[in-house]
Amino acid sequence: MSHSVKVYDTCIGCTQCVRACPCDVLEMVSWDGCKAGQIASAPRTEDCIGCKRCETACPTDFLSVRVYLGGETTRSMGLAY
């Protein structure tokens, strides 16, 4: 099953999602758009198992990382990888 992992520009660079992912789908990359100077990126979405631990770990009010399973669709906001 194909999963889509999207990282939005509300990411605060805390690394919680990266540490929560059991499949190393996420990594931090440099980005000047937030105080932390980094943002989560999802370069290995093919390894995503859809557990949504990254979503659970995200401390922002608007989840900065979202996993869309199979047929779920959304209009992308911010940065999508």
Swiss-Prot record:
Apoprotein for the two 4Fe-4S centers FA and FB of photosystem I (PSI); essential for photochemical activity. FB is the terminal electron acceptor of PSI, donating electrons to ferredoxin. The C-terminus interacts with PsaA/B/D and helps assemble the protein into the PSI complex. Required for binding of PsaD and PsaE to PSI. PSI is a plastocyanin/cytochrome c6-ferredoxin oxidoreductase, converting photonic excitation into a charge separation, which transfers an electron from the donor P700 chlorophyll pair to the spectroscopically characterized acceptors A0, A1, FX, FA and FB in turn. It comes from the Eukaryota. Residues 2-31, 39-68 form the 4Fe-4S ferredoxin-type domain. It catalyses: reduced [plastocyanin] + hnu + oxidized [2Fe-2S]-[ferredoxin] = oxidized [plastocyanin] + reduced [2Fe-2S]-[ferredoxin]. It comes from Rhodomonas salina. [4Fe-4S] cluster 1 binds at C11, C14, C17, C58. GO terms for biological process: photosynthetic electron transport in photosystem I. PANTHER family: PHOTOSYSTEM I IRON-SULFUR CENTER (PTHR24960:SF79), PHOTOSYSTEM I IRON-SULFUR CENTER-RELATED (PTHR24960). It is an enzyme of class 1 (oxidoreductase). PROSITE patterns: 4FE4S_FER_1, 4FE4S_FER_2. Binds 2 [4Fe-4S] clusters. Cluster 2 is most probably the spectroscopically characterized electron acceptor FA and cluster 1 is most probably FB. It is found in: Plastid, Chloroplast thylakoid membrane. Keywords: 4Fe-4S, Chloroplast, Electron transport, Iron, Iron-sulfur, Membrane, Metal-binding, Oxidoreductase, Photosynthesis, Photosystem I, Plastid, Repeat, Thylakoid, Transport. Pfam families: Fer4_7. This is Photosystem I iron-sulfur center. Its EC number is 1.97.1.12. [4Fe-4S] cluster 2 binds at C21, C48, C51, C54. It is a peripheral membrane protein. GO terms for molecular function: 4 iron, 4 sulfur cluster binding; electron transfer activity; metal ion binding; oxidoreductase activity.
